[in-house]
């Protein structure tokens, strides 16, 4: 994860967290209550995990509990019209709460044209600060999410918004390539569990990147995994060191 927003300069870390996991896991929620005042916390609605945004009332509950730095607006996977409808309705609810943080809209669509139409509905709104591009949006474009980002840049559709990449590909090609590409200039940040997921499975991430190991799918109980034993912890540390090395590459922020 890397940010280019000067407003984040004071923050030690950026966290993307799930509203539905806050609801299910008191320990998880308590941790983010502690760090929300110092770190940059993005509250996600869990659309990728649940197939549709977690109930608005649940997400709003955790907006009030945590006062996060940024909130992901309601959306529905691959559904342009429902995403626009839900996001606009959620913005009204946030206004009623007098939420003063930032908001992230996540364009959706059944094809590339619909995705761009959805983007246009958010691009000029002053109450939308960030555009989130979820990983599977890349399936709408011939060359994946990198193709999507290149088209955004060519069409000059990035505007004055921050851009955040939701999730990473299993081979981590994007983290290896995007720092060297022109699209890097408007991307603020990325979140991914890949380095931790590999570690818990005993897999060194450099082996996945080299194609000599297969990426293990994230465990269903990922958010409830116990603290790792020493051998697994060593692999997780290795994977996080690889992440640090990738982030030292020449991002043009």
List where the protein language model places each region.
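Conserved beta-strand positions
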Residues: 18-19, 73, 133-136, 165, ...
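Conserved radical SAM core fold
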Residues: 72-80, 112-113, 131-142, 172
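Short, well-ordered coil/turn segments that N-cap beta-strands
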Residues: 13-14, 37-41, 67-69, 99-103, ...
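Conserved, mostly hydrophobic/aromatic
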Residues: 44, 105, 177-178
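Non-catalytic, usually N-terminal nucleic-acid engagement modules in DNA/RNA processing proteins
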Residues: 1-97, 244, 251-253
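Alpha/beta catalytic cores of nucleotide-metabolism and tRNA/nucleoside-modifying enzymes
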Residues: 1-3, 57-63, 81, 92, ...
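His/Asp/Glu-enriched short active-site or ligand-binding loop at hydrolase and phosphoryl-transfer sites
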Residues: 128-140, 189-196
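Short loop-to-alpha-helix "cap/lid" segments that border enzyme active sites
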Residues: 98-101, 109-129, 139-163, 178
């Amino acid at each position: 994860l890397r940010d280019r927003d000067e407003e984040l300069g004071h923050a030690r870390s950026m966290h993307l967290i799930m509203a539905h996991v806050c609801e299910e896991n008191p320990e998880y929620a308590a941790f983010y209550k502690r760090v929300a005042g110092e770190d940059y916390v993005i509250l996600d609605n869990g659309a990728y995990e649940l197939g549709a945004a977690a109930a608005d009332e649940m997400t709003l509950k955790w907006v009030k509990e945590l006062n996060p730095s940024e909130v992901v607006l309601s959306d529905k996977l691959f559904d342009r019209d429902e995403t626009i409808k839900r996001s606009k309705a959620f913005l009204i609810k946030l206004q009623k709460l007098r939420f003063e943080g930032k908001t992230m809209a996540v364009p959706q669509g059944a094809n590339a044209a619909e995705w761009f139409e959805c983007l246009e509905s958010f691009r000029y709104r002053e109450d939308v600060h960030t555009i989130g591009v979820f990983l599977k949006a890349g399936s709408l474009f011939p060359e994946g999410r990198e193709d999507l980002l290149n088209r955004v840049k060519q069409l000059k559709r990035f505007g004055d918004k921050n851009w955040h990449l939701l999730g990473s590909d299993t081979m981590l090609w994007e983290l290896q390539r995007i720092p060297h590409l022109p699209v890097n200039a408007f991307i603020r940040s990325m979140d991914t569990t890949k380095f931790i997921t590999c570690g818990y499975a005993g897999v060194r991430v450099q082996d996945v990147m080299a194609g000599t190991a297969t990426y293990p799918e994230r465990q269903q109980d990922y958010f409830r995994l116990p603290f790792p034993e020493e051998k697994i912890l060593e692999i997780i540390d290795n994977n996080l060191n690889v992440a640090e090395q990738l982030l030292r590459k020449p991002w043009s922020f």
